[in-house]
């Protein structure tokens, strides 16, 4: 059973904005504390759109990490996760469809910041071993962000009556935990000592 989010307060029977006839637009710039988020439905859809944006940014960023990595196991693990991330994008598109919503993304400053920091930290490292350790740490920061988002979305999906969406997202959460565990094992067994 995958671990899930900590948001368990019941919100009653609420329909998502899509079911109430309101579609959130992709160019809408909602912040977490935005006045545009006035209900649990709004927050749920914003978070779904947020992780959709994040997964797409991760798909764009992973090839650069793979290219910089020198450790064969790290390259292989990141390459495998790139394929998984592409599947995560497809699953999110499926979730939007299950909710009857148009696929939309909202900017996610959190993932932008994590990826920017990863790029900056790994940009000027001359030692291949240190660079691999930095890449693994950056990839884990990404994994941890994804784990929090998917755990929360699973809990909220269940609370809002979208059990089918929760089950779909649980597949992704399981893969995110597995990727994080592999990165931890690799870092502890090889990368950190080689650095």
Predicted segments with their positions:
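Amphipathic alpha-helical hairpins
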Residues: 13-195
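Extreme N-terminal basic, low-complexity initiation segments
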Residues: 2-6
